[in-house]
Amino acid sequence: MKKIPPAWFLFFFAPLTAEYVSGSSPYLNPFVLLANLLLYGPGALLIRELKARWRKGWLAVFILAVAYVVAEEGLMLNTLFDPTKNTEGRLLGVNWVWTSGMLVVHSLVSIFAPILLAEAIYEEQVNEQWVKPRTFYVLLVVFSANVLGFGRLLAPSHRPGASYYLVEAAIIGACVWLANRVPGPRPATAETKPAHSNLWLFVASLSGMLATMVIGFIVPALPVLALAKVVVMLTFCLAFLGFLHRNRAFDPGLDPLSKFAVASGIISFWILASPLMALAKGNVGPFVFAVLMAGFLASVQKRLKKGPAS
């Protein structure tokens, strides 16, 4: 696996869990596959590169994940504003409950878990830049063209007015500005010793992800105020992140196996949920991808246990 450059690994791995293990995307549509690769791949890579270049920690990553959500679900797919779908808590033309759910899912599944897993596998290169400056700007152009161009083909109707695009651009710019200015972590003087075993970290991450996602599925259907739904969903997500922080999951010197335990715990929620997703979608695609993902994660764990030489 180490023969594959880390940038290429992250590029191709990023869309797998969010779109294919979850069953969110059709499996036999090459155009959607291309759109996903040019969306999730550059998106995760750009965020990871800014983290490395600016010498920031995971706080900057989660701030940039907000910008990613606005780009994908707002500028590209228009789900944040579509008046015909997911309209719970709609106010000022925004589907706020859906927006909250997308912030939770994408920040954890599309951005955090893939980057953390990649940095566990490529531990020796964790502080390095994975792409050259020219490649970085190529990725930015490809990502932008995909969002603004392909998005019009995938979701051409019910688009908001020009003022919404200006607000979205302002939010993305503000997130980039803020991520660049938040304090970075203190340099690791030695490898962080986790407070718990890797198995404990895996089970805790899986349990936290399970609780966060169950809340995300159940709360939107409850007969309560939309504002309360938004608050509950985001609070549970922040509580999960706080739990990970207290257990040193975000420490810069965290060892590769502990990073893997946290990332695989988050990803494994979708593996366990795949039979239900397969039933809901009426095809075996989510289950097949989940089995492949489980096998891949088992292989990665085996290699990491052998040490850097593997």
Labelled PLM ranges:
Residues 90-105:
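Short aromatic-rich membrane-water interface segments that cap or initiate transmembrane helices
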Residues 1-45:
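N-terminal signal-anchor module of multipass membrane proteins
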Residues 189-310:
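Extended, charged low-complexity segments
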Residues 18-23, 75-82, 142-159, 211-218:
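C-terminal ends of transmembrane alpha-helices
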Residues 31-81:
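Membrane helical hairpin/interfacial module
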Residues 37-48, 102-119, 167-183, 232-243, ...:
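Hydrophobic cores of alpha-helical transmembrane segments in multi-pass inner/ER membrane proteins
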Residues 130-139, 158-167, 187-207:
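Membrane-water interface at loop-to-transmembrane-helix junctions
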Residues 20-30, 155-158, 219-222, 275-283:
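Short, hydrophobic transmembrane alpha-helix segments
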